[in-house]
Amino acid sequence: MATSSHLLPQALHMIPRTPSFSSKNLGVSSILPRASSVNSRLSVSRVFLNHSSSNFGFAIDSKKRKEFIAKAEESTEGETEAVVENAVETEAEGEGEATVAAEEAKPPWKTRVKLGDIMGLLNKKAIEVAETVRPVPGLRTGDIVEIKLEVPENKRRLSIYKGIVMSRQNAGIHTTIRIRRIIAGIGVEIVFPIYSPNIKEIKVVSHRKVRRARLYYLRDKLPRLSTFK
């Protein structure tokens, strides 16, 4: 009994200690889940931050990719435009060189000679030849001239015609003059080609000053205006 009486107070004295110990243990155990919950929250927040940072990084990467793609497209467009411009310039240079080469290869342009020019040259040469054979004096309207003409029907005898020059018709080698004279009271007009080979000599007797190029009015005037010694 003594032992039991001694044991009971000890047991009673030991019982509250165990609850305190248990309470301490419970306190530690209660602290541990709180720490674990805090750690879990921190881990969750870290995961969320990591996830958000990864999303933000992905957004930044996507923006950078878009900008890089846009820059690449711009660079490719600029390169294509530069290539097209270079191709156009090379084509223009090639065309210019081709035109220059074609112009150099072409023979020099020859001036076209018209039929009228040819006839003028022929008349000029014929006049030069006729003047070398027989010189022709300067004949003007109003001059009194003396012409020695060879008539084939008259056995090549020379006939002398004298008169006043009424007009002159310039036609190259076919230039003619019209001479007027009064014969037996009648006015006679004769046309002579001055470069004809049948005319052997043309001599200017005298010069008269007149105001007109053609003296056709002498037909209506008195015969004394058309007579001379």
Curated annotation (Swiss-Prot):
Located at the 30S-50S ribosomal subunit interface and binds directly to 23S ribosomal RNA. Belongs to the bacterial ribosomal protein bL19 family. It comes from the Eukaryota. This is Large ribosomal subunit protein bL19cy. GO terms for cellular component: chloroplast; chloroplast envelope; chloroplast stroma; plastid; ribonucleoprotein complex; ribosome. It is found in: Plastid, Chloroplast. Gene3D superfamilies: 2.30.30.790. Pfam families: Ribosomal_L19. The keyword Transport does not apply. Residues 1-70 form a transit peptide. One of its GO terms (molecular function) is rRNA binding. It comes from Arabidopsis thaliana (Mouse-ear cress). The keyword RNA-binding applies. Part of the 50S ribosomal subunit. Keywords: Chloroplast, Plastid, Ribonucleoprotein, Ribosomal protein, RNA-binding, rRNA-binding, Transit peptide. The lineage of its organism: Eukaryota, Viridiplantae, Streptophyta, Embryophyta, Tracheophyta. One of its GO terms (biological process) is translation.
